[in-house]
C-alpha cells in the first residue's frame, strides 16, 4: 500500500514537471517578435547607413531606405525597412 502511494506520487510529480516544461516552451514561441514594418523616416540626416545601423541594433541583418508612397494626398517618403 505504501509503495503504490509512493509510485503514484512520483508519477504525478513527473507529469507536472513535463507539462510545466511544455508550457514554458509554448510561451517562448508565442512571444517571439515579428519583423517590423518599415519604421522611421529616412531624411538627409538619417541615411541608409544610419538605417542599416538602426536595424542591426534591432538584431536584423540589414536596413535600407525604401520609397513609400502614402495615401492621397500623395505624400511619398523614404522609410527605413529592416530585413
UniProtKB/Swiss-Prot annotation:
Designated name of the protein: Putative defensin-like protein 66
Main location: secreted
Pfam family, one: Defensin
Disulphide bonds in the chain: 38-82, 42-65, 51-80, 55-81
Any one GO biological process: defense response to fungus
Source organism of this protein record: Arabidopsis thaliana (Mouse-ear cress)
Similarity annotation: Belongs to the DEFL family.
Position of the signal peptide: 1-22
Localization: Secreted
The entry's keywords: Antimicrobial, Disulfide bond, Fungicide, Plant defense, Secreted, Signal
Any one GO CC term of the record: extracellular region
Amino acid at each position: 500500500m505504501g509503495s503504490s502511494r509512493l509510485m503514484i506520487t512520483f508519477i504525478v510529480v513527473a507529469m507536472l514537471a513535463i507539462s510545466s516544461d511544455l508550457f514554458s516552451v509554448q510561451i517562448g514561441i508565442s512571444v517571439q517578435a515579428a519583423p517590423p514594418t518599415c519604421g522611421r523616416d529616412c531624411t538627409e540626416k538619417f541615411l541608409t547607413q544610419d538605417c542599416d545601423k538602426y536595424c542591426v541594433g534591432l538584431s536584423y541583418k540589414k536596413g535600407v531606405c525604401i520609397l513609400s508612397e502614402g495615401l492621397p494626398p500623395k505624400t511619398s517618403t523614404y522609410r527605413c525597412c529592416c530585413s
